[in-house]
Swiss-Prot record:
Protein name: Synaptotagmin-10
Sites where the protein binds Ca(2+) 1: D262, D268, D320, F321, D322
UniProt keyword terms in alphabetical order: Calcium, Cytoplasmic vesicle, Disulfide bond, Exocytosis, Membrane, Metal-binding, Phosphoprotein, Repeat, Transmembrane, Transmembrane helix
Record note on domains: The cysteine motif mediates homo- or heterodimer formation via formation of disulfide bonds.
PANTHER family for the chain: SYNAPTOTAGMIN (PTHR10024), SYNAPTOTAGMIN-10 (PTHR10024:SF46)
Annotated GO biological process: chemical synaptic transmission; exocytosis; positive regulation of calcium ion-dependent exocytosis; regulation of calcium ion-dependent exocytosis; sensory perception of smell; vesicle-mediated transport
Source organism of the structure: Homo sapiens
Lineage: Eukaryota, Metazoa, Chordata, Craniata, Vertebrata
Amino acid sequence: MSFHKEDGVNSLCQKALHIVTELCFAGQVEWEKCSGIFPRDRGSQGGSSTDISVSLLAVVVSFCGLALLVVSLFVFWKLCWPCWKSKPVTSNITTLPQSISSAPTEVFETEEKKEIKENEKPAVKAIEPAIKISHTSPDIPAEVQTALKEHLIKHARVQRQITEPTSSTRHSSFRRHLPRQMQVSSVDFSMGTEPVLQRGETTTSIGRIKPELYKQKSVDSEGNQNEDVKICGKLNFTLQYDYENELLVVKIIKALDLPAKDFTGTSDPYVKMYLLPDRKKKFQTRVHRKTLNPLFDETFQFPVAYDQLSNRKLHFSVYDFDRFSRHDMIGEVILDNLFEVSDLSREATVWKDIHCATTESIDLGEIMFSLCYLPTAGRMTLTVIKCRNLKAMDITGSSDPYVKVSLMCEGRRLKKRKTTTKKNTLNPVYNEAIIFDIPPENVDQVSLSIAVMDYDRVGHNEVIGVCRTGLDAEGLGRDHWNEMLAYHRKPITHWHPLLELPGRATSFDSQGSCPSPKPPSTP
């Protein structure tokens, strides 16, 4: 009986517990009343809330870490990206000398310590890394890289110094600053010397200045003439410019050691002075009787603007006065550069040698013309291009120039042609061609006489100056003719100085025997 009673009580207890559980979890009874009945469920409920808070904390920490990582990446990109971005740009812009020299510098700095410890090792190992690094530069041509590598390997031992072995590679790296156009194989990399071009100079010397190409014949000829000119005394004068009144003040002080022109062994000297190219304004000193060392002490003034002084020349002519005949010229002094001594702001004293001369050398101007000869047609063309700085022949300070060309043979004038007249100018431009028929067999027998004339409506036309060209001419006239014969069918152009007419009979109107040129054979 007792056994059945216990079973009934247990079943009732289980049913009661089941009912209480349903009521507590259904929410119909306050949880505080049920907490004493279900202690384990309370602990599990607290554990579940703890698990939820831990998971939330883990989520927050993960989010903060991710945000910190993003910020770190952003800062790293801002700091390092400009450097990486600039590397390809600078490598493309850098020229060949920079691309070659930048790589070996780092390599040689690391190799210095090795060379101090191991002096017996060849320098080729230190050079090869530099060459390999330079291969990465896109600006270096493959041919230059190959030539540079071969030459550096060949001259590796030469680059060492006995006293300072560590500096040899460093200096050799600087010597590789070569232009792109220069041939590397033609440069000497030896220490202590500058690169010297050898056989490759002819193909790589583009852009180099060769002074011998700029030598002018006129300068050389003037130097030779100055060596042959005889000195006949010295002239002392002073120069100063008056800025307020725009005047060039010239004071002729004295002359020394003049030659004797009279039979008594003395002279009666005086000085005439021009400021070229203007000959209208002329000054003359007093005549000093019977002396070879006259003391003039006279001052003259030329009205001229300061900015025009660079284009002016001061011309002194020393004469011997003769009462009964023509005055004899002793010599002359020409000061080409007025700023030779100073800027003329203060009085400058000048001593010049007097060059002996029998006639006064006058700057008559220059003429430019071209010569062209066609041997097959037997035709010579002289093109008068222009003149410059002609002598003023009219009282107005200008001229009416034209050019007359005469075909001469042994002093006889065969034909003559002339250009049009240009009015009131000292720098006429013509561009007119004059043609003469000259067979090839007669070219060596003829010459051309060119005279610049001043047209005068009332009186006779005056000769300003003349020049000649031909095999029998002198200086530039002969050279111009020979150059024309050497280069057929090609116009040869030169400037020619105009000279004074030595005599009408010898230049234009003299008669002589000369075979007339045969007409060119017609095919």
